[in-house]
C-alpha cells in the first residue's frame, strides 16, 4: 500500500501533477466519500496516477482511501477556515 502510493506520488511530483489523497483513520469520511465517484478498488501505482492525470473525469477533487482500498475519487472536502 505505502509503496504504491509513494511511487505514484513521486511520479506525479516529477511531472507537476497535483493530487489530493486522504487516508481515513479514526474520523469516518463516509459523508465525503458519498460526494465522489465510488471506486472500491485495489490500490495500485498505475490507478492512482491515472486518476489524477489532468483533463480526466476523476482528476478534480480528492481520492479517499479506506483501509487497503480506494473508496472514492473526485470527492469534495470542506474548506478550512
Model-inferred region functions:
Residues 1-81:
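Divalent-cation
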Amino acid at each position: 500500500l505505502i509503496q504504491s502510493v509513494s511511487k505514484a506520488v513521486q511520479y506525479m511530483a516529477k511531472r507537476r501533477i497535483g493530487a489530493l489523497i486522504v487516508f481515513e483513520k479514526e474520523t469516518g469520511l463516509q459523508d465525503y466519500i458519498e460526494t465522489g465517484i465510488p471506486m472500491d478498488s485495489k490500490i495500485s501505482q498505475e490507478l492512482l496516477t491515472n486518476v489524477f492525470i489532468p483533463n480526466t473525469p476523476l482528476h478534480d477533487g480528492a481520492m479517499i482511501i479506506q483501509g487497503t482500498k480506494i473508496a472514492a475519487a473526485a470527492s469534495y472536502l470542506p474548506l478550512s477556515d
